[in-house]
Amino acid sequence: MSRHNIGFQVVDRVAQISHISIRTKRFRSLYGTGWIDFQQVILSKPMTFMNRSGEAVKKTTDFFHLGMEDVIVVHDDLDLPFGRLRFKQRGGDGGHQGIRSIIERMGGNSFLRLKVGIGRPPQGMDSADYVLDVFDRTEQSLLDQILSQAAESLKVVLLEGLQKAMNQFQKKG
């Protein structure tokens, strides 16, 4: 999988540890429903092109009668060092085409995001090529730990709140 798919990898890890099957094809997504402790969740992965993710998110939220406050989007972030996690509520798209699509389709930006750092491309490499490239050997060796940490941070958000998750998982710097 490419760096651009790290959000999907986090969702897959949440599904794995929560025993939620993501196999239903609907709303231009693959999704599954289940429970994380006492919190009911819908885990969804848009099956559109990245720059049309908003179509799938909008169809899913409309069907399940969810508001923006019920949505957490997990995505890659070039501006964060590899493996760094950062929660953000509101704000612009930061140049991320998938986030831009979600903001446009949802009609606002107040959904919560978990940004997962993928770092900047090496000197001379195009950003588009970099995000579509696979993780290098060093990154690959750290990926399992990062995915587990990201999945755990989402569980903390759901069960104990955003502030607790930010304090526990968001490193300064």
Question: Which residue stretches match the model-derived regions?
Answer:
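Hydrophobic alpha-helical segments within soluble ligand-binding/sensing domains
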Residues: G95-G98
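Nucleotide and nucleotide-moiety/phosphate-recognizing core
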Residues: M1-R90, R100-L114, P121-D126, D133, ...
